[in-house]
Amino acid sequence: MNRVLRLAAPLIVASFVAACALSPGDSYVGGLETPADAQVLAAGMVEFVGAQLPAASSTVALDPTPSDQASNTLTPAFVAALRDRGFAVADAGQAGTAGTHHIRYLVTDLDNGDLVRLSIDGGAEASRFFVRNTAGGLQAGGPFTVRQMAEAN
């Protein structure tokens, strides 16, 4: 139990730190070590989105990152991976269209890897840690931890 607490505590703290610095509708991408990191993270993120939404009939809009992160490498990799999976990705002008699903993503460097947090329409939330392998590349450190928010009546 003590080991689990020691592993979970940094993840929880990193989640709170990333969330405190943002507006409620912002996404966030911390510094990625290599360009290949964006591809690995994007593929993992699309895996979760694909499990939650039907690709062929879903339009998604990504919550924007702050202006100082506009040139991050993850956002275009995530958009490309979503399109490759069959999702329609709305641009900023289409984001308010009825039926569009909103995705917020937070990526924070943590220990020897990156912590990814995703939410879809403020409902389904997921977290996954990506760890560096012995070759220096990122790989999933386990499955997504998913929390479904209860629907308001």
Identify the role of each PLM range:
Residues S27, A38-T73:
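Post-signal-peptide N-terminal segment of Sec-exported extracytoplasmic proteins
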